[in-house]
Amino acid sequence: MTIVVGACRRCQNRAMSPTPRPGPTAFVLAGGGTKGSFEVGVLQYLVGVEGIAPDIVTATSAGAIAATVLAQARTLPEFAQRVDEIEGDVLAWTQTEHVFGKQAWLGALEGTALGREIHNEITEGTRPPFPLSPTGALAGSEAVPPASAGRRERRQARRTRRKRQRHMLRLAAGAGFRLPRVRRHLRTSGSSVLNLEPLADALRHGTGDGVRPIDPALIRRPGLQLRLAVTALRAGVLRFVTEDGTIVESDARTPAPGAAAGPVDLVDGAIASASVPMVFPPRSMADDDYVDGGVIEIVPVRAAADLGATRIFAVVAVPLTLARDERDYAAAPAGYIGLRSMGMIGVAERQIANLNASLPEGVTLTTIDPVVDVVGLFEVQPGLLRINKDYGWLRAADVLAEGDAAIAADMVDGTHAIVEARREAWRLEESLWAAGPADGSAAGTLALVREQKELVRELVDRRKQLGFAVPDGCEAWWTGYEAHTTGRPGGLPVSPSS
């Protein structure tokens, strides 16, 4: 039988076995773009607090980048060091030049308003909506009103969409002199918008101030099995790249056709696993072209069991149960519909299917997953990345906590409330940063920030009183501002509490 521990709310119930056999431990790191910042916090808790070290690491997409760094370790102190490196790598993603490169056709629009608009739409357009404002509108989503909106709000939304369409047409007209060059590049690089060459270079050579290089020789050492999930476009199947660069079939062991040509570069394997189709180009390895393993397997739990793991920690970056989205999708642009249906609903359902995979008797599966959606798939806002990382730490502590079930459930609700309050404080601070202290509404906005900070302090105090863990330095959550892409404007107090 399989033991299921944790909060996989929509996974099927399974019988409990009282004495799971001892054996290898696996970390399974799911995909999710920059939502993977959640996984950093989970790893910090598992390794740094619980003292758990993996024998097996399987991963997909953004999880594969973290897994490649983690797989250089063999001892608990080494794992702790590598988790610190993963944190530094993820926070360095805010310097987009270390991660994303522009495909030639988008590069041809460099310096134009249209080029900036396209880039910003990718990095910020996937941001989860904030809760309803007091007026009933979705904050930041004026172009797509709630389904409950009245006639006036719908008219306003239509005007907003038409205004945006005219804006995009003006941008295209302004970049018209570049369009012949764009068309030429589209013939050769039109399969995607961005590329991951800067990240690949950083993983090979380092950036000096952000992403650190990996050492494939350390990964190849005995003592840890690594599997990076990739999707073979020509064969149309799931495969894995191993710790020594061998491409194997979906059973995680059998060498794939073309493997006889020799091992592939581990950085290529990690980048292929993270190459979301149409956003990033396929990666050619051996006799096939590969994209994100999450097309088929977002949470490669089965591979961990196939390699002999009897204790599996599945770390999920995208919520398994989606919050209800009140946008009126009958009136929404195609991009919103595609993101919601394929990028969110489809991902959630594949994750659940992966977590419900049939596992051998005696295997313990612990799922650590977010409930609050904090950051977009490719968003690089430093404040939201940090909030999501801290959320992962708290969520892992909640799932692994022992004691009274009612108190534990209360703490889980408290964790989500902490994250929501910090995210709302970040949003309010962003409006302060944009308007400046001279704006007439600044004092009122700052008062709202203070309310959120006080709520966070109260929730953390309650957590500590009940004996639940909190991370070191959490006082900064209410004594300071959240992180932003620019420094605090002059004229605002040094601390929101002052």
What does each of the following model-derived ranges do?
Residues M1-V5:
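Extreme N-terminal basic, low-complexity initiation segments
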Residues A66:
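Catalytic DNA-binding helix-loop module of base-excision-repair DNA glycosylases/AP lyases
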Residues C8-T60, V69-S498:
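Patatin-like phospholipase
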